[in-house]
Amino acid sequence: MEWFTQSDERITLRLHVQPGAKKTEVAGLYGDCLKVRLAAPPVDGKANDCLMRALSDWFSVPLRQVSLKSGETSRRKVVEISGSNKNPQELLSG
């Protein structure tokens, strides 16, 4: 199973997040997910906010076009991004 699906202008990502890291960055693949380290603690939604802002920046879309579909309180998350023509594979190349 691939860590992302892409159709028209929608990208769906399967993520494994690691909150409380030194900096927010892509850390490679983790099974069938993209691993993302987050420089925010997993309290009061701070890690989710950090993730949404990072994805908004990485995919060059407004924050309102990034939505958390599942995994609000889990390390495994599914996120949908609309309106980006960026290839998700580019996240792995830095």
Per-region residue spans from a language model:
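Contiguous, often N-terminal, cationic amphipathic patches that form binding interfaces
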Residues: 1-45, 49-52, 61-63, 67-72, ...
